[in-house]
Amino acid sequence: MQELMLSVAVITYNQEEYIAQTLDSILSQEHNYPYEIVVGEDCSPDGTKKIIEEYVAKYPDIIKPLYNNPNKGLIQNYFNVIAHCKGKYIMECAGDDYWLPRKVKTQIKYMENHPDVGMCYGVVQYIDGRGEKKKSEFAGEKKESFEALLRGNCIPAVTICMRNNLVTEYIKDVNPLEKGWLMEDYPMWLWFSQNSRLVFQNKKMAAYRSLDGSASHSQDPKKRAVFSKSAEDIQHFFAKKYYDDEKLAQYYATKELVKLFSQANVSRDRESIIKYGKVIPKAEKTIKIRLKLFLVKSPVIFKLLFERKWIRVFRK
């Protein structure tokens, strides 16, 4: 019997408008690898389940549905789907995103030729709720090291291909379900960067639907704050796990400097912006921080920016 090469993890909830496009983009991939699509349908009140049932009837040997009742929530639904993935590799596609052609063939060929790589990932095109491309919005960049990822998540889950055996090791080592984190993927990327090798492929692999209602794109400041706090908890956990005492102290000191810099920006304290900006380590100075420091050098420009609010970068 041929080895099951790939499991595609699909988690979906209330996505009747998009789930057919998601499944079609996976089913239409050109390759000869044995594969399965494991779909976690999280007790949607809309017509998502009915659409999935129609696809299961057409592709009973490929699509493996998991119908939750009651609703499990994003994190538990995700790990339940992962637990049912039997392939050598796992790829992901949320029920409102879709893949671009040749993703499977490109990534599995690469992984088969590079056994030292635990996960590869690529670039996504942002789209809106209508499926229209957002101008100049792409996600995915070369951040393959633990230190780079600790500064923030830049890996689009819809573009990844990872080794299933390493996912199993991660779950045993970290037990993420007990942590209460609001992100299912970011902790795993951090763990992978320490226990294998990550590789960025500078190719568009998928389309990511950016919807205002999601936790990471919520327009509600309170929801955004809770999501950001969870990301910070994840970063602290892995910094403690993998850094020695000296490096951990440096990490916390830098985090505090960045926080003070942000607070100075909100309070429009030009002197403090310059003061804290100068001592933030070079590696931690994002493009946004560098731009702020450049612009605040001139008191006149600084005043104009805040009074007229010409440049959005100065708003929190």
Regions found by a protein language model. Give the residues of each.
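Short, well-formed alpha-helical segments that are part of the catalytic scaffolds
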Residues: Q15-S28
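A conserved acidic beta->alpha catalytic loop
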Residues: S25, E41-K50, P70, A94
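Glycine-rich, basic loop-to-helix element that forms the pyrophosphate-binding segment
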Residues: N68-C85, T106
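Flexible acidic/His/Gly-enriched loops in nucleotide-sugar-dependent glycosyltransferase catalytic domains
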Residues: Q76-F79, I108-Y110, D116-K172
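Short aromatic/hydrophobic "clamp" motif used to bind/position activated sugar donors
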Residues: I90
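Conserved nucleotide-sugar donor-binding catalytic segment
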Residues: G140-P221
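Catalytic core of nucleotide-sugar-dependent glycosyltransferases
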Residues: E144-L150, W181, Y208-D212, H217-E246, ...
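Membrane-interface aromatic/basic loop that binds lipid-linked glycans or pyrophosphate carriers
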Residues: F261-K316
